[in-house]
């Protein structure tokens, strides 16, 4: 009898990948979406009212990149984060994002703008992304920095809390510039 080769064990996905979650609120629901994590076998969505304790709301497959929470209260602040898992455990998670359901006096971020969509830098040089947010009508309350920045490959380029890119090594990466509700602009960085 020929011997049957065992199934090769799937290698663990690369840890620390960037995962950006986004919330789009309606009156009684919040639609969540998120960026792809390579090797993810499932995603778990956690959330709560802003003053509540975050708990697991839903687990979805690794091919799913959106989910909507329904039956929420209008004009209320909710917080969420998304985590990606494989059979070895958690690969990565997003930062906590905050959004306000409509129908009340609370505003939400409706647009993010950046001064440049791409930067080409020599190793060791720096450049600054100037990102701005535009809120909807109403009272806007900040729960995080106005814009948060994250590099998809910190060995190529890092980015500071103020949007200063530093070129580290030859290659390409992206910087996500995202508002507290996860709305983002993606900036390409090329290091020569």
Label the model's feature ranges.
Residues 69-90:
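Beta-strand-rich modules
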Residues 104-192:
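Extracytoplasmic soluble-region selector
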Residues 2-39, 74, 90-104:
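Pro/Thr/Ser/Gly-rich low-complexity, intrinsically disordered linker/stalk tracts
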Residues 46-50, 85, 150-152:
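Predominantly extracellular/luminal cell-surface or secreted proteins
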Residues 63-68:
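Short S/T/G- and acidic-enriched coil/turn segments that sit immediately N-terminal to beta-strands
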Residues 37-41, 141-144:
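Short proline/glycine-enriched turn/loop motifs at strand-loop junctions of beta-rich domains
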Residues 37-39, 87, 134-136:
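Short solvent-exposed strand-capping/beta-turn motif centered on an Asx-Ser/Thr pair
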